[in-house]
A protein has these predicted regions:
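N-terminal mature ectodomain segment of secretory-pathway/periplasmic proteins
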Residues: 37-119
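Short structural boundary motif marking the start of a folded domain
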Residues: 65-67, 159, 259
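A cross-family detector of function-defining hotspots
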Residues: 74-76, 150-152, 316
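Boundary at the C-terminal end of the N-terminal hydrophobic targeting segment
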Residues: 28-31
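Bacterial N-terminal signal peptides
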Residues: 15-25
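Flexible, processing/modification-adjacent segments and terminal tails
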Residues: 33, 37-48, 107-172, 176-181, ...
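Pepsin/retropepsin-fold aspartyl endopeptidases
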Residues: 81-83, 89-92, 153-154, 164-166, ...
Length: 520
């Protein structure tokens, strides 16, 4: 509900899905959806609260001036900076924490991001659409089904409104009784509860903006930004909100149009040999990983420096930090100055293979990755030289979470699934299985799936049919689980038990994956 780019900054981490990984939320679902505490009976009507809010938000930022903001940032135990350039509805945000930086923005309706390795990509903004749905519901005076005034907060001198429309964000807005500004927002994302407070509002370009914003999630991760300077540039330059140029992180040998990767296929997973410093390690070729991930043992052996510290969560909580790897070699390919997440990787595809890392988003984003499981082939191609096979189907991918989400049909339902080469089992959400009428067709007892921090349960089922890109698979077995699959707005994770039926080319540059049925 806050117009400011700073106020609406999403505290969101990319999904990381590993071999045979299901992600389940740590907090209990009931606690996540509980009403805020400390409320008393409401002293106004919902209509009055909406009118108060609208009076405070009657204007939007114009394109007559660029709003320039500099903030002091505290995040992940690190002090940094946060800069915002805003021109009308367009904005560009830059977060800097020590030697690491990333940017996000909106340009003419297109969401974009430059990640910590300098790769720029656009994405549909499916999670932002949830926020927009809730915003419209709150501001729609006729919607009293999805919006409720649930009480007053004496601690914040605010009215508290619950907003929970279908396809929207479940949130609680604390509307200040005097100003009509939102002073606190609690919301649910990935089955985790977030609380954001907004303080010290000031009028900027006719719009009230906070000067201090603090967000804490239910794991205790915290981000706080305090305004240092805010100014208006009356001679706006559209370049202030432009996308930055993208950096290339994968270096190919000269005059080579394809590089075969040093890979072994173990239990359906592509295990690639990666040289880091003077050590050789096994990494998963993992489209389901939202970045490059390395095990802490590699950091220790190579004497790499760590930056920041936070808690992650899948099946349990675990510490994670970041590092910069001077060089990684994958066959004839080189990656230099790579920012990686440091997370313990507990998977062993077989008795003699210990996975020490994941080749995720950056590798897939800067090379066309070709996988043919039937031929035990994995290769990387320079994007500028790639030509899609004439007999392949093209399927659009969405990179909101730095993982390839596609439209698919399972049973009788259409859904959104992630193509995950780092998982050897396919998992669908229980709600999606019910919608597709394939949940009751159980063929075996409950199974256990291991992930970061522990295990979860899943139930095998048989699908009458499954389709991606016009290619149908019939009578396949998949798992069904009532679990968080690592990101919001996803109905399933398609693992290599399904993907092995395809010859695949991942082309993130054009947001496309090319598929054809594998020849046997």
């Amino acid at each position: 509900m806050i117009g400011s780019a700073a106020g609406r900054t999403r505290v969101r981490r990319g999904a990381m899905l590993l071999a045979a990984l299901l992600s389940a939320a740590v907090p209990a679902a009931a606690a996540v959806d509980d009403e805020p505490g400390g409320l008393v009976s409401p002293s106004a009507t919902l209509g009055r609260v909406r009118a108060l809010y609208e009076r405070a938000h009657s204007r939007e930022h114009s394109r007559g001036a660029t709003v320039l903001e500099d903030w002091r940032l505290f995040q992940d135990g690190t002090v940094g900076s946060f800069r915002v350039n805003r021109l009308g509805k367009d904005f560009r945000e830059t977060t800097t924490l020590g030697p690491l930086a990333y940017e996000r923005g909106l340009l003419h309706g297109t969401h974009w991001e430059q990640n910590r390795n300098g790769i720029v990509f656009s994405y549909p903004g499916i999670h932002e659409q949830r926020d927009a749905v809730s915003d419209r519901a709150f501001r729609d005076p006729s919607d009293e089904r999805d919006v409720r005034l649930i009480g007053d907060s004496p601690a914040f001198n605010a009215y508290v409104v619950e907003v929970n429309p279908p396809a929207g964000r479940h949130e609680w807005l604390f509307v200040d009784k005097r100003s009509g500004n939102v002073v606190r927002r609690e919301f649910v994302e990935r089955r985790r509860r977030y609380t954001t407070t907004y303080d010290d509002y000031r009028l900027v370009d006719g719009v009230f903006e906070p000067s201090r914003v603090r967000t804490v999630d239910s794991l205790g991760n915290e981000r706080e930004q305090i305004l240092v300077n805010r100014s208006l540039d009356a001679t706006p330059d559209p370049r202030d909100v432009d996308m930055p140029p993208s950096r290339h992180v994968v270096e190919f040998p000269e005059r080579q149009t394809a590089v075969r990767l040093p890979v072994r296929f173990i239990n359906g997973l592509a295990v690639v040999r990666v040289i880091v410093g003077r050590g050789a390690y096994d990494f998963l070729l993992d489209s389901g990983a939202a970045g490059i991930v390395i095990d802490p043992s590699v950091v220790e052996q190579q004497n790499l420096e760590r930056y920041g510290q936070r808690l992650g969560a899948t099946l349990g909580t675990f510490p994670e930090s970041s590092t910069i790897v001077p060089q990684m070699s994958i066959g004839g390919l080189r990656m230099r100055g790579v920012v990686a997440r440091v997370v313990r990787v507990p998977f062993r595809p077989d008795e003699r293979t210990h996975v020490s890392g994941l080749l995720g988003f950056e590798f897939f984003a800067d090379a066309v990755v070709h996988l043919d499981f039937e031929k035990n082939l994995a290769e990387a191609l320079p994007p500028e030289h790639f030509r899609a096979p004439a007999d392949a189907s093209s399927v659009g991918i969405a990179l909101d979470d730095k993982t390839p989400a596609v439209a698919a049909r399972a049973g009788s339902a259409n859904g959104r699934v992630v193509l995950d080469t780092g998982a050897n089992r396919t998992v669908f959400q229980t709600a999606f299985a019910d919608r597709g009428d394939f949940a009751p067709q159980r063929v075996a007892s409950t199974t256990h799936v291991r992930g970061m921090g522990g295990f979860t349960s899943a139930e095998p089922t048989r699908l009458a049919q499954f389709e991606i890109g016009g290619i149908w698979t019939r009578g396949a077995t998949a798992d069904v689980a009532n679990a968080d699959l690592g990101t919001e707005d996803v109905d399933g994770i398609i693992g290599t038990d399904f993907l092995r039926t395809y010859d695949m080319w991942f082309d993130y540059r054009t947001a496309t994956v090319y598929l054809r049925r594998a020849k046997r």
